């Protein structure tokens, strides 16, 4: 299942009227508003673009108070749902800002705070070099290990494996490192701005995979340009959360 939409910087004011700003989740409302207010008119290569992403994440994090590191699974938490998330290139913590925290808020709006174990991918530098290599090897191995940990420690949880940008490469790589039984046990996979868009996930039913790729997102064709369309996947987290908990 794939969603796409043509988005350009010049259309953002119009898009803002259509974004889900009337949701009950005030954190998500605030985040989307701040994102639109601070979204850069960007058309940069990876090295320059990631610097801008880091600056944008800093602004969004300070204004919204978004949590950038989660280690619930490592702390022994077993909830009904477990989100294991890999952040995008140049993002902070183990969870990032642009997609990870908004996705958490949308999920918690459905299952409550007690219904969700939240875990970011560790040992993952989220560097440009990692993206160009097809996804950081250490981060990929850590995500595979986290999924295996959830499978053994919390067999009744419903795992949502998710990532943004290079984080999607991490998801693809990690699932490829799992045995067939563990991979097929994953409840849902949700990918935002996937450089490997169109590549099947080993031993995961395609009906359980949802990919968001904006038409104007060069990263979704494994490119090396950062454009505004790559920075606004927070607008999709409500429908993503509905899918992930279905």
Language model regions located:
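Active-site regions of enzymes building and remodeling cell-envelope glycoconjugates
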Residues: 204-214
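Gly/Ala-rich beta-loop-alpha elbow adjacent to hydrolase catalytic centers
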Residues: 161-167, 171
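Extracellular/periplasmic catalytic domains that process cell-envelope and extracellular macromolecules
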Residues: 75-78, 112-113, 153-154, 163, ...
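Active-site nucleophile loop of the alpha/beta-hydrolase fold
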Residues: 188-198, 214-216
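Fungal secretory targeting signals
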Residues: 1-26, 246
């Amino acid at each position: 299942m794939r969603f796409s939409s043509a988005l350009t910087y010049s259309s953002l004011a119009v898009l803002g009227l259509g974004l889900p700003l009337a949701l009950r989740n005030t954190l998500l409302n605030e985040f989307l508003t701040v994102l639109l207010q601070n979204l850069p008119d960007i058309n940069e290569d990876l090295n320059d673009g990631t610097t801008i992403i880091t600056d944008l994440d800093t602004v969004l994090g300070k204004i919204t108070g978004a949590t950038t590191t989660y280690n619930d699974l490592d702390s022994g938490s077993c909830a009904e749902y477990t989100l294991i998330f890999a952040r995008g290139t140049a993002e902070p913590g183990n969870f990032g800002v642009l997609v990870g925290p908004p996705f958490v808020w949308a999920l918690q709006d459905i299952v409550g705070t007690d219904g969700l174990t939240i875990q970011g991918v560790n040992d993952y530098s989220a560097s440009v070099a990692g993206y160009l290599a097809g996804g950081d090897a250490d981060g990929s191995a850590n995500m595979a290990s986290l999924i295996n940990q959830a499978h053994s420690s919390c067999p009744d949880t419903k795992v949502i494996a998710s990532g943004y940008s290079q984080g999607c490469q991490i998801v693809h790589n990690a699932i490829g490192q799992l045995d067939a039984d563990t991979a097929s046990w994953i409840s849902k996979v949700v990918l935002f701005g996937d450089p490997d868009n169109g590549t099947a996930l080993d031993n995961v039913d395609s009906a359980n995979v949802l990919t968001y790729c904006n038409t104007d997102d060069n990263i979704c064709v494994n490119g090396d340009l950062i454009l505004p369309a790559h920075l606004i996947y927070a607008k999709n987290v409500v429908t993503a959360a509905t899918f992930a908990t279905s």
